[in-house]
Amino acid sequence: MVQRLTYRRRLSYNTASNKTRLSRTPGNRIVYLYTKKVGKAPKSACGVCPGRLRGVRAVRPKVLMRLSKTQKHVSRAYGGSMCAKCVRDRIKRAFLIEEQKIVVKVLKAQAQSQKAK
């Protein structure tokens, strides 16, 4: 005969916080074990990249609070908040903007020297 199972806690509804799995005890009984909710790794701060960040533990917020800093970020600029590709693009963009400013400054200086002649 099939063994009937009952929840071990008071909540009797099949909600997200009441998910269970079956487990066989050493006494050969089948009982419910409550499963923890699955964590998600953070998304990139750029908002463009679809995936989750690599190198950051995918855990629930309460567990994240207890983790060490090395498990919550990667050792890079914007590590733990932006993905590597976006950081690379941001650095390139900043470099090109600075180069453009220098070019404008040089062109102004040349125009100034042309007027002085």
Curated annotation (Swiss-Prot):
Segment forming the signal sequence? none
Gene Ontology CC terms: cytoplasm; cytosol; cytosolic large ribosomal subunit; endoplasmic reticulum; mitochondrion; nucleolus; postsynapse; presynapse
From the record heading this protein, give the residue positions of the covalent cross-link Glycyl lysine isopeptide (Lys-Gly) (interchain with G-Cter in SUMO2). 108
Tell me the residues on which N6-acetyllysine occurs: 36, 43
Q: Which residues carry this modification: Phosphoserine?
A: 12
Q: Which GO terms describe its molecular function?
A: structural constituent of ribosome
Where in or outside the cell? Answer: Cytoplasm, Cytosol; Cytoplasm; Endoplasmic reticulum
Extract the InterPro entries matched here.
Ribosomal_eL34, Ribosomal_eL34_C_sf, Ribosomal_eL34_CS
Key words, A-Z: Acetylation, Cytoplasm, Endoplasmic reticulum, Isopeptide bond, Phosphoprotein, Ribonucleoprotein, Ribosomal protein, Ubl conjugation
Q: Give any single GO term for biological process.
A: translation at postsynapse
Record note on quaternary structure: Component of the large ribosomal subunit.
Q: What does this protein do?
A: Component of the large ribosomal subunit. The ribosome is a large ribonucleoprotein complex responsible for the synthesis of proteins in the cell.
Q: What does the sequence similarity comment in the record state about its family?
A: Belongs to the eukaryotic ribosomal protein eL34 family.
Question: Under what name is this protein listed?
Answer: Large ribosomal subunit protein eL34
